[in-house]
Amino acid sequence: MKAVRKQDPAGSRASILEAAQELFLDRGFAGTSMSEIAKASGVTKSLIHHHFGSKEALWGSVKRRCFEAYHQQQVQLLAGQPLTPKTAKASMRIYYEHLRDNPQVLRLMWWMLLDGDDDRSNELVAELGDLGVEQIRGLQEQGVIRADLKPESILSGFLGLIHAAFTEGWMIERRDITPDGYVDEAWQMFASAVFVDPSD
């Protein structure tokens, strides 16, 4: 089996990533060994090092894999047009749907927090963060968004409202609201707090 995978670099790499993602999400970066990944993927440790170089680089590839689709959606939405209340709400919905449809991403984020990992180590996340801050700062300069708040704090609040939908269920039972309804309410709270005229 290993000999066949050595002749199939793409298949080997995919098998390693699949096994690494499953183990990292189950045990975290610190709790997962390269030997365990090699065993689960059916390859040698040397082949993992050949494809990824190190455990840290493999972890980075897993994080990139989890965020690629979300990154592409957000860049397509935000990079080609100015930020408006309409596009900001669409961005919020994309984030909500990504976490809803990919629960492994939220699990990954918790492991990153527990392991003391810096989100900025993921270039896709860093690019989106920089893009969001840049868009917010531009609207502050135009008088569209409140200028008395730091753009980084505004972006954190934006993301936090969506995180709460998935992390606060143990504390607050919401029987009377649909997922779409939650995003609408989260948007109303955010827009009324930061946009000078949220109806634009």
Each PLM stretch: what is its role?
Residues 60-91, 132, 138:
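Amphipathic alpha-helical linker/stalk segments
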